[in-house]
Amino acid sequence: EAPVLVHFHGLEGDSRSHYAEALMDHCVKNGVRGVVAHFRSCGGRLNRLPRAYFAGDTADNSWVLKNVHARFPKAPFFAVGVSLGGNQLAKCLGDLGKAASFVTGAASIGAPLDLVAGTEIMTRGANIFYGKMFLSTLKKKAEEKARLFPDIIDARAIRACKDLYDFDNVYTAPIHGFRSGMDYW
């Protein structure tokens, strides 16, 4: 049976990200069934809940891995995560422990293991452009969610965010049950 590879993209990525497309093209050319899992509100559709996704959130990853494996139970099964997706994948497999024994192999590429340092790096040098790009798309989605959930998401506070640190303090942390960005990181 043809092998299966599940790919978890990075922050604000999706199946159209250049690295996801390249990986899936490689899968097709080599007889591998490739799957790209979209994080909540990535891939062009806003999810219907106030929450989004964050580095330590592994429930969706676990669900994807188990459900894809259930469709191809006899196939060699691989998973790869890039950047934030690598962080989530590594944590997910650790959380699953022996329940992840169906995974033949996995790779975490460029995962931000130190979120404090990673967020800080996005505020200086050439990385500031990435930080601003991520912040722009994250804010847009959070503002859309604020229109849907005005009692729990403060659109004005979202608009006032100047960097990822602000965003994690105003949205990511509180909406996912953390006291602050630092508590989340």
What are these regions (language model features)?
Residues 2-10:
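Short beta-strand element of the alpha/beta-hydrolase
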Residues 13-16, 24-48:
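Conserved alpha/beta-hydrolase
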Residues 21-25, 62, 66, 90-94:
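Short, hydrophobic alpha-helix immediately C-terminal to the catalytic nucleophile
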Residues 40-78:
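Catalytic nucleophile-loop/oxyanion-hole region of alpha/beta-hydrolase
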Residues 72-176:
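Alpha/beta-hydrolase-fold enzymes
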